[in-house]
Amino acid sequence: MASGILRVLEPGQLVPFGGDRVTAVSAELAAAFVEGDRLVVVQQTGDLLHVPRAEHERVHTAVTDALAAFHALAAVSDDQLSQFFGGFADRLADDEVFAGIARANEADVESAEARCRSTTRLVLSPKMRADMIDGLRVWQHTDGRRDVQLGRVDHDGWWVETRRAPLGVVGFVFEGRPNVFADATGVLRTGNTVVFRIGSDALGTARAIMSHAVAPALEAADLPHGAVRLIDATAHAAGWALFSDSRLGLAVARGSGHAVAQLGAVARQHGVPASLHGTGGAWMVVAPDADPAQLALAVRHSLDRKVCNTLNVCCLVHAGAARLAPVVLEAGRSAAEQRGARLVVHAIASAVAVAGLEAIAQDVDALGTEWEWEHDPEITLVVVDDIAEAIELFNRYSPRFAASLIGGSQVDQQRFYDQIDAPFVGNGFTRWVDGQFAFDQPELGLSNWQAGRLFARGGVLSGDSVHTVRTRAYVRDHHLHR
């Protein structure tokens, strides 16, 4: 069948997707599309994503540089990698160097505030700065793990080894927060390179970190400049172009649910494995025999701030709801008061009687909503007949991310673990779901099971887990043959 170059789009032009469906080109898309641009058709949804030529070329150049740097890293010593992480951390810790980064961040924050954008994670606070430095120090002092024996099988006259090896270029699309640098550059420890796009709110800060800290640290360690590439672009099209580049070894997306799902679909249809950190919100199921003091601690410590592992839905088993709902509400109010805030409660019909007069009534579909609060903690309450119903609701409505069962017997806890469809399961507070907190390693992202279970890996993606496996044969007896 003949093929050609896409040069123009017409309003109303039908575009097939998904094998048996079509979508139409809008007048706006047709007017914007010119020769040299690219059209990405998302096969899951029919979304038509316009990638202007300039964005494609910018991304293509960055990935080309990163791929060349990846091959160059094979000749780089582990000490050089340690020197890079140490130099990066030292520059962030140097007040004179950091002053330029701080000024850029202040400008980003002012711009975001003027546009009524959230700045909760945009401000490069002293704590965020310290956490970035600490994360880089972890990578600085981590043993080299680019070539590690995983297994060995001996035969007469020969043996084979499986060995961990670097994967390639890792593409990131991050939300607008500065601390992602420490996460993204962690892949260099295992011999990989990185290309990333950061949310436009934090782009000025990202440019400053690159020029004041990353680039000098790469140069001082004699590492290729392409080992860490920032895509200097504000358009979402840069992210689409990056994830549609089949030369990536892995695509990692962090941000809002829809945008992350769309990016993941783009990556997968181009043959790129994807790790998606999208919709979050943890669930807590409260058994009738739950200890009130333990329950109060679990709730309070799960609502200290809004991140992906914050308590979002609380399921109370009916037999204990009247006794334990006040404990949940009081603990939630306590967490809110520590922030100078108030607790916002959403109640499914079954929970209206125990949720308090100020509760906001919601349909059952609200169980699938992650409350993206900034200041006032928000939770949804639902009353269920038993733990089995709570599991059923979680598996139907949640993003299948994190769940805890408070109380219950050992049999209840095991059944909960066996039947709940989540990568993270516990019996206490939900905020433990974090790579640094749980595994002492800076994380690149956390994945839910909303799009299915993950092949051969856990829900925490760290720099140490980005690798492939090679097999090497050693022949002693060269008479060996098949």
Predicted regions: what they are:
Residues M1-E161:
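N-terminal Rossmann-like NAD(P)+-binding subdomain of aldehyde/semialdehyde dehydrogenases
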Residues A2-V51, E57-L67, R400, G408-R482:
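C-terminal segments
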Residues S77-Q83, G100, A221-V228, R305, ...:
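Flexible, glycine/charged-enriched surface loops at secondary-structure junctions
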Residues E96, E175-G176, D183-T193, I209-A220, ...:
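ALDH superfamily catalytic-core signature
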Residues E113, S125, H155, W159-V160, ...:
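A structured beta-alpha segment of the ubiquitous adenosine-cofactor-binding alpha/beta core
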Residues D134, V138-A217, A221, V260, ...:
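Conserved small-residue-rich beta-alpha loop and adjacent elements
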Residues A319-I420, F424-P442, R453, R457:
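NAD(P)-dependent aldehyde/semialdehyde dehydrogenase
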